[in-house]
């Protein structure tokens, strides 16, 4: 019973969103998310996700022009999600690079210690 009520409420919320024109702040938030992704290097580190975010935001604008507010609303949301994914993938790639660099530095130091002090540093 409560599950049916939850489903009906969800459908009602979705139906309400479908007829409501997205606020300009929704577009601003999506744009800011794209800029944030660019700042963390998504152009290089997560280009596909960043491209999807840009395309979906552009499509949302077209949806607004043709008064397809429900489509525009969902495309704005998808744009933000793709931007967030681009941010996280970029951060992950950056962290992996740092770990790799530090591992290599540790290996070099270990080799130098072994060369200078022998097997006691293994």
Residue ranges, per PLM feature:
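Bacterial signal peptide processing site
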Residues: 18-20
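Pro/Ala/Gly-rich low-complexity, hydrophilic intrinsically disordered segments
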Residues: 85, 89-122
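C-terminal motif of bacterial Sec signal peptides marking the signal peptidase cleavage site
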Residues: 14-16
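Short, low-complexity, disordered segments immediately C-terminal to signal peptides
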Residues: 22-31
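Bacterial N-terminal signal peptides that target proteins for export
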Residues: 1-6
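Post-signal-peptide N-terminal segment of Sec-exported extracytoplasmic proteins
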Residues: 25, 35-78, 119
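A structural signal for well-ordered alpha-helices, especially hydrophobic packing surfaces
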Residues: 34, 57, 61-64, 83, ...
